[in-house]
UniProtKB/Swiss-Prot annotation:
The lineage of its organism: Bacteria, Pseudomonadati, Campylobacterota, Epsilonproteobacteria, Campylobacterales. Mn(2+) 1 binds at residues 386, 390, 445. Belongs to the BPG-independent phosphoglycerate mutase family. InterPro entries: Alkaline_phosphatase_core_sf (IPR017850), BPG-indep_PGM_N (IPR011258), Metalloenzyme (IPR006124), PGAM_B_sf (IPR036646), Pgm_bpd_ind (IPR005995). Binds 2 manganese ions per subunit. Signal peptide: none annotated. Mn(2+) 2 binds at residues 11, 61, 427-428. This is 2,3-bisphosphoglycerate-independent phosphoglycerate mutase. The active site is at residue 61. The gene is gpmI. Catalyzes the interconversion of 2-phosphoglycerate and 3-phosphoglycerate.
Amino acid sequence: MAQKTLLIITDGIGYRKDSDHNAFFHAKKPTYDLMFKTLPYSLIDTHGLSVGLPKGQMGNSEVGHMCIGAGRVLYQDLVRISLSLQNDELKNNPAFLNTIQKSHVVHLMGLMSDGGVHSHIEHFIALALECEKSHKKVCLHLITDGRDVAPKSALTYLKQMQNICNENIQIATISGRFYAMDRDNRFERIELAYNSLMGLNHTPLSPSEYIQSQYDKNITDEFIIPACFKNYCGMQDDESFIFINFRNDRAREIVSALGQKEFNSFKRQAFKKLHIATMTPYDNSFPYPVLFPKESVQNTLAEVVSQHNLTQSHIAETEKYAHVTFFINGGVETPFKNENRVLIQSPKVTTYDLKPEMSAKGVTLAVLEQMRLGTDLIIVNFANGDMVGHTGNFEASIKAVEAVDACLGEILSLAKELDYAMLLTSDHGNCERMKDENQNPLTNHTAGSVYCFVLGNGVKSIKNGALNNIASSVLKLMGIKAPATMDEPLF
């Protein structure tokens, strides 16, 4: 069976029986139509307990790629941290205690929602209450979501935060995630969020009034303009700061702005000393204490391929590059032996519905080049279904699917010509459901199944399964015995 193999991840394209508001169903997709007729396919679970998340929790790109690469179910940070907090272990957490003991004032910042992709509001509340038990003054810096949850749900989450506020816990600032959680080096966005932390951009309104004023201007949660509230005078030297997001990719830039001595992305008010801690490891170069260090993941797909002295190439555009490198390799930043990485720049647009094809063509050209070079394993992510789906724009999401389909057609044709095997699946769904039951735009991921197609010598049928079955399936196509730590293949 041994073949050179393609692992294609069509981000955000999921399975849904209903056709209403289903961008995948309504797209013209001759390549998918061909695969449905000629290739064995099945359905793959991407959410909840199947990927180490709480029951019913929607999957996401980080969790999905980690599970794909590991070939087994991993307890994700959300579950691990929640269990720790439920067991009252925070009072014995050395990184947490050391950080809050260094100052009377503790700043907590993070995404205020229960989306569970980057953070969870229960973690936010638990840390604030634990700080209060230690007689600290707690400043809450709220980042509104509107992307992993409904676009106008911030007031609901705000009430939960206000329920714990008192003379010791106060809401200091607010910012839409578009500004405070950029990951594409758009530091003009980070600067606005940073300035609010410094006590600039004051509003006389209360937090709830300010959110409503943004809604009145047709600004939804994701894009709420950073502001700080009365009685907040800004962060001061020698105070403590904890960023409560457990996912790292959208936390790095704001933490860099706060803590890095050498920082030139914008002119800032710098600190002599700020006692920073992060929920999980955000970057290997960061010297900050970590409340929940990563658990080591051994024998990932990329590592096993490297151990067999085979070549591999990981390809994606900017928005998903971390997912096909750091996350799919089990949280390992450094490439393995014989691992090549190709980064295609994502288009510089405000939102991707303005360019639904994104950089899929550039990604495809890189894949075709690696195939012609004879690379043994090619892992590629197409970001369109997810990134355009997040905008809530149905017509643009249809175009996104059509762009991916055209690219898949080129890849599938060359795969057959060069005798490449192929496994195509998604890390989670998104664009197959673009409106909720009330006909409001749905911008978050779906908690459902995705397709899995296989092109391989002798493969006539494949079983239903989950993302933890992908790595062993890829290794089987390559003629490599999967390690005992991996779950069974799909065929």
